[in-house]
Amino acid sequence: MNAQEIIRSIEAEQMKTQLPVLHIGDTVKVNVRIREGGKERIQAFEGTIISMARAGINRTVTVRRIFQGIGVERVFLVHSPRIESMTVTRLGKVRRAKLYYLRDRIGKATRVKQKITRKAN
């Protein structure tokens, strides 16, 4: 085994298997473990995915939300042990790979169209 194969095998052990299918424009709820002092609690962060980067264990997702009139963005490592769970609450319909233009929008203009899925008969 060479060094790359060893690294791949270690990374494969650390990767999460139970992940939802994520797409740009989806609204997701991310539950993150936060340590405050000696206590550990779970903090929820819900927002729209504006970008996804990298692959494998280094995959990141940038989530944006508006909190008290101010835009807040957080970058999450998808396979991090700090992430308790990730759930898709709403499917978005967009035609871009990066939604950085949402940073310049205010109010209702920041909404993303909802993807409507129909069941086949």
Curated annotation (Swiss-Prot):
An annotated GO cellular component: cytosolic large ribosomal subunit
GO BP terms, alphabetized: translation
Keywords: Ribonucleoprotein, Ribosomal protein
Pfam families (UniProt xref): Ribosomal_L19
UniProt keyword annotation of Ribonucleoprotein present: yes
Alphabetized InterPro entries for the sequence: Ribosomal_bL19, Ribosomal_bL19_CS, Ribosomal_bL19_sf, Translation_prot_SH3-like_sf
Record bears the keyword Ribosomal protein: yes
A GO molecular function held by the record: structural constituent of ribosome
HAMAP family with a match to the protein in the record: Ribosomal_bL19
Protein family membership: Belongs to the bacterial ribosomal protein bL19 family.
Protein role: This protein is located at the 30S-50S ribosomal subunit interface and may play a role in the structure and function of the aminoacyl-tRNA binding site.
Protein name (Swiss-Prot/TrEMBL): Large ribosomal subunit protein bL19
Taxonomic source organism: Gloeobacter violaceus (strain ATCC 29082 / PCC 7421)
Species lineage: Bacteria, Bacillati, Cyanobacteriota, Cyanophyceae, Gloeobacterales
